[in-house]
Amino acid sequence: MATMHGLFDLKPGIEVGAYREAFEAFCRHLKEQGYVTRWSFMRRSPHPGYDRNPPETAYYVSVDFPDRAIAEACYRYVAADEEPLRTLHRTMNRKVVPTTTRFFLFEPA
């Protein structure tokens, strides 16, 4: 398994539900193509005990892939920037503050 993690903020005026809909549509398409197994979208929940050097961003996503090879293939698919994925990706990305986005891939140790 490999997991892409993302941290970001929504642009002012963007409703959480609007982003969730766009993210779900994007991930459903990737699942239909055989790249993604599951995903999640969460909001940071500040906590006086758990918070040690927390991110400044409010939102988090994760996208799980069966393995590193499929994660790499998915990256190439998204980077190709072709329809129908282009519209789904741009619809989702237009809702986030680009300067706050951080994405990274993790694998089991």
Where are these predicted regions, by residue range?
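Active-site-flanking beta-strand signature of metal-NTP-handling nucleotidyl enzymes
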Residues: A2-D9
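Short, surface-exposed ligand-recognition loops at beta-strand->loop->(often short) alpha-helix junctions
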Residues: K11-A18
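An amphipathic, aromatic/His-enriched active-site/gating alpha helix that lines ligand/cofactor pockets
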Residues: A25, H29-T37, D51-A58, S62-F103, ...
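Short coil-to-beta-strand
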Residues: M1-A2, R102
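Short amphipathic alpha-helical segment that frequently serves as the phosphate-/nucleotide-binding helix
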Residues: Y19-E24
